[in-house]
């Protein structure tokens, strides 16, 4: 259940990009930390060194509660599994990065929120050979990694060897092969999509049923869907035996836009517009990343204002979803009552 929850509630590609800024600036942040400031997560680092002697190649604190460890690539699945199951970590997100101009390699980051004992963030980093872009898949050991590894494969062309599900995740079926959007040198917009065919190229998987099940397609456009998404229900009579789905129909390529067309101070306007009802959360995430990368101390008053606005936005989102639950069941009067409350709670 935990693995499926975190896969379904994957934390969005925009957040991945801005989190990369924080991680890549690790050297700057490490120097800016006060020597007297307590660094959280030291016992996790000690546990890693004890369980895997000689595997940790480097480590650095980005902030007092954010630790990045670079490990040998062949030990990646074991290290993530150890932190996930033995140390109480939750795999929050994973992403790739093109660091060839920095060190000649690609890199993949697995970000875990440590919830057992001392709470902090630990990011497991591995360098991937630019000439042979392969690394061992974590998914067979930690199933929650499947979405992230599929996305890294799509966007960077880094192959997770042993990944059980090799279907595309973000890119459409007619996207040109060997064109990976988030590589730094991926700027050839002259390539065109492959010709479309009547045959379906994306295979929806029915793991729990068999070929006797009827298939009920829902989407990608449906009256009850807020965003485009295609669901396949495998049914036996009235019982749903299994389900599979495909999202990212409105993927807008915001990372590439921010990277190639905007300065650091202009991305805030883009992050505000990622989502119609949670713009402040996205803009706060980006701003916090830049502040951490630059070693900027945020005034307490600014932190309090952010907390208040984030809480108002959270309540706003809860009310909206409660109203939508009423709408989906045909109780539109309930939806309108919640919508009326939204008018008085909106941060704007």
Predicted regions and their residues:
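Terminal low-complexity/charged segments
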Residues: 6-239
């Amino acid at each position: 259940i935990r693995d499926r929850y975190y896969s379904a509630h994957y934390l969005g590609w925009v957040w991945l990009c801005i989190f990369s800024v924080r991680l890549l600036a690790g050297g700057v942040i490490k120097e800016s930390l006060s020597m007297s400031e307590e660094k959280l997560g030291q016992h996790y680092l000690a546990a890693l060194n004890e369980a895997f002697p000689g595997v940790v190649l480097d480590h650095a604190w980005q902030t007092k509660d954010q630790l990045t460890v670079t490990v040998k690539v062949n030990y990646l699945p074991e290290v993530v599994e150890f932190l996930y199951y033995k140390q109480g970590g939750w795999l929050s997100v994973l992403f790739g990065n093109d660091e060839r101009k920095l060190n000649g390699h690609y890199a993949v980051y697995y970000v875990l929120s440590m919830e057992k004992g001392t709470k902090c963030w630990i990011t497991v980093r591995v360098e991937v050979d630019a000439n042979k872009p392969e690394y061992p898949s974590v998914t067979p050991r930690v199933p929650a990694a499947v979405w992230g590894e599929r996305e890294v494969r799509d966007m960077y062309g880094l192959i997770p060897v042993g990944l059980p599900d090799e279907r595309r995740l973000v890119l459409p079926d007619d996207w040109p092969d060997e064109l990976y959007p988030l590589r730094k040198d991926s700027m050839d917009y002259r390539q065109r999509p492959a010709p479309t065919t009547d045959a379906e190229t994306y295979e929806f998987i029915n793991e729990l049923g068999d070929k006797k099940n009827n298939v009920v397609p829902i989407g990608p456009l449906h009256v009850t869907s807020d965003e485009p998404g295609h669901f396949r229900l495998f049914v036996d009579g009235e019982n749903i035996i299994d389900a599979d789905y495909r999202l990212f129909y409105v993927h807008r390529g915001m990372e590439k836009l921010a990277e190639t067309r905007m300065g650091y101070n202009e991305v805030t306007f883009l992050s505000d517009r990622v989502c119609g009802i949670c713009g402040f959360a996205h803009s706060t995430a980006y701003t916090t990343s830049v502040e951490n990368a630059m070693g900027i101390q945020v005034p307490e008053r600014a932190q309090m204002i952010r907390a208040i606005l984030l809480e108002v936005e959270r309540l706003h989102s809860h009310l909206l979803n409660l109203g939508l639950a009423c709408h989906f069941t045909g109780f539109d009067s309930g939806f309108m009552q919640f919508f009326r409350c939204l008018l008085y709670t909106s941060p704007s």
